[in-house]
Regions:
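Non-heme Fe(II)/2-oxoglutarate
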Residues: 1-99
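Catalytic core of non-heme Fe(II) oxygenases with the double-stranded beta-helix
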Residues: 93-208
Length: 209
């Protein structure tokens, strides 16, 4: 793994604040992997979404690689399996396990690309409302030039208290799914990110059971 002292800092931030913000040079992705991910996300077919998976108000274009309605299902397109091969390579999986402080087996449950254009946003929500077994959301920033679009994470016990993260190109956010959050309105440019959710449960989505 990369600089262990720095990774410990990320792990501590995740534990204390519910989110680790990781600069590009410290993510587990190689330059080649990052370029391939960008290509897949750029080319995947997208749909406009106004209501999110946690029933939150949205205004976002979404490209899907894996869905999690009743159970995790890989979307049939040219890119899903290639993307999964990258995301679940051994070093990336172990990196995420380290940050979220678990030795348990973890699984991919949902993977999507979120394209947020000017005046668009992702509303306030809890990821565990989509699936109560979600452990962490991992957000890889692919957008370069945009204003606004802050990743805002709220204190679990006080909605008036929050931390804003301005994600730089190539950065990775790993966020505890028990913390409410939103993406504020993009005021200029286009914000694009790959979002994938991990869980200790590979089976049926308990939201629907």
């Amino acid at each position: 793994m990369k600089n262990s002292e720095t990774l410990e800092k990320f792990k501590k931030n995740y534990d204390l604040n519910g989110t680790a913000y990781i600069e590009k040079d410290f993510t587990p992705f190689s330059d080649d992997q990052f370029l391939k991910i960008s290509e897949y996300c750029n080319n995947v077919e997208k749909e406009f979404v106004e209501v999110g998976d946690a029933d939150e108000p949205n205004h976002v274009h979404v490209g899907r690689f894996m869905t999690d309605i009743k159970k995790p299902e890989i979307v049939d397109n040219l890119y899903s399996n290639k993307l999964i091969d990258i995301l679940w390579s051994k070093n990336i999986k172990s990196y995420i396990q380290f940050i979220v402080n678990t030795n348990d087996e973890i699984y991919l449950r949902r993977i999507q690309y979120n394209q947020i254009n000017k005046d668009c946003f992702v509303g306030y929500h809890l990821d565990i409302d989509s699936n109560p077994d979600y452990l962490a959301a991992c957000v890889l920033q692919l957008g370069k030039n945009f204003d606004g679009g802050l990743y805002r994470v709220y204190n679990k016990n006080n909605k008036k208290s929050f931390i804003d993260y301005k994600p730089d190109y190539g950065s990775l956010l790993i966020s505890d799914c028990q913390y409410p959050h939103e993406v504020t309105k993009v005021t200029d440019g286009e914000r694009g990110s790959l979002v994938f959710f991990v869980s200790k449960n590979p089976d049926l989505n308990k939201r629907n059971n």
